[in-house]
Amino acid sequence: EEGISDEEIRRVCQYVNADHFIDKLEHGLDEEVRERGNNFSAGQRQLLSFARTIIHKPSVMILDEATANIDTETELLIQDSLEKMRSVGTMLMVAHRLSTIQHADNIIVLSHGKILEQGTHQELLAKHGRYYQLYTLQYHKEQMEE
């Protein structure tokens, strides 16, 4: 885009951890992006979308399943990026993977369009409600897969 320098693009890509794979590309930032970005993994596309968002300095970001369909290594990069992005503006995140939202200021647990409970990760765990049940199930599933 006009008005955005290569230096600013590099800085933002580093900020969201996209530099981890961009530096390995044959043409770096000048790499051709094929239709639907199919020459990149789902996680790489997600990191690029974060960079595109951050470069425009939004006050509100809406993220829907930011860590869906990605490998564990890329999930860690995305989670690190999300943590950094919290300082950019307000984030509204939709997530089934609870590890994605456990550092959120406020978590709202919905079921069939109704709010079941809300609070921080620690507050919701202490309530032993639906969030606690979901977290326990996901945590045990992840432990068994390791």
Feature names for model-found ranges:
Residues 24, 110, 137:
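Conserved residues at the C-terminal ends of beta-strands
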Residues 23-27, 142-143:
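Short, flexible cytosolic linker that couples an ABC transmembrane/permease module to its adjacent nucleotide-binding
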Residues 12-16, 28-128:
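ABC-family ATPase nucleotide-binding domain "signature/switch" substructure
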